[in-house]
Amino acid sequence: MSVVDQKAVELPPRISEAGVADYFALLKPRVMSLVIFTALVGLMIAPGHIHPVLGFIAILCIAVGAGASGALNMALEGDIDVLMSRTANRPIPRGRITRGEAMGFGLTLSFFSVMTLGALVNWYAGGLLAFTIFFYVVIYTMGLKRRTAQNIVIGGAAGALPPVVAWAAATGSLSVEPLLLFLIIFFWTPPHFWALALFRSDDYARAGVPMLPVVAGPDATRLQILLYTIVLVAIAAAPWPLGYFDWVYGVTSLILGAGMLVLAIEVYRHRTGSQALRATRRLFAFSILYLFALFAVLLLDVVAKAVAPLIW
């Protein structure tokens, strides 16, 4: 019996004491906030016009679909969540919600988010949302997370799809711009989560999750963080010279990218002691700011272009 299997039987009694706050926690609201924001950007920069009500429905369905994925993820990972200090206070490890209830909740939200998006907006977007949920729950959670150190790299595709779904909701098609947004999030994911994994490696080792620092060691992880950051900075800047986004975005991406690169170099250089811990925590925190700020510039640019004719 593995460590995870031995510990799984020590979960709190499965008598549900769930309240609204517990079900809300299943949705992973912090992750959902990032999904909502990136999806909103994908919707807003799309060409043409979508009725505001349909736009709201699209973002709501994408958010609920993301929450459904979070609930299903927690239902499937209750046995390892109880072993990790970062996740031990989630509703299932605390015995507030049973795994069966979380599974039912997640499946219900998945069904209604996909069907509502498809029926009221378009089935292209609905199909992409269904694929996103499937990829996160089945491919990443069930297939990759406990089996390979590349779990975050491949699984990151699910987190990169919301702006693509939103673009499809607005246009009923795909083009280069949403794929660029996808690539930015996709290559942002490994440095972000590997920085977290570096200072939470004991947690992952205890739970038997083969994150890169556990399998390959911290030095190899630091090198991978640096390499992925270099690729991220290049991809994030590319839409400007390619003519897809304007100079305001381009300059912002270079400034933010320089910050990411400097912090990634610091993580690579400082390998032991308090400096190493501080460097990884700073990169993790800045990476969140980086993605929000990069997408915020795109959103502000759309708003500015819409408002400018009213002012001048």
Curated annotation (Swiss-Prot):
Keywords: Cell inner membrane, Cell membrane, Heme biosynthesis, Membrane, Transferase, Transmembrane, Transmembrane helix. It catalyses: heme b + (2E,6E)-farnesyl diphosphate + H2O = Fe(II)-heme o + diphosphate. This is Protoheme IX farnesyltransferase 2. The chain crosses the membrane at residues 31-51, 52-72, 119-139, 152-172, 179-199, 225-245, 247-267, 283-303. Gene3D superfamilies: UbiA prenyltransferase. GO terms for molecular function: protoheme IX farnesyltransferase activity. It is an enzyme of class 2 (transferase). Pfam families: UbiA (PF01040). Carbon 2 of the heme B porphyrin ring is defined according to the Fischer nomenclature. HAMAP family: CyoE_CtaB (MF_00154). One of its GO terms (biological process) is heme O biosynthetic process. InterPro entries: Protohaem_IX_farnesylTrfase (IPR006369), UbiA_prenyltransferase (IPR000537), UbiA_prenylTrfase_CS (IPR030470), UbiA_sf (IPR044878). GO terms for cellular component: plasma membrane. Pathway: Porphyrin-containing compound metabolism; heme O biosynthesis; heme O from protoheme: step 1/1. It is a multi-pass membrane protein. It is found in: Cell inner membrane.
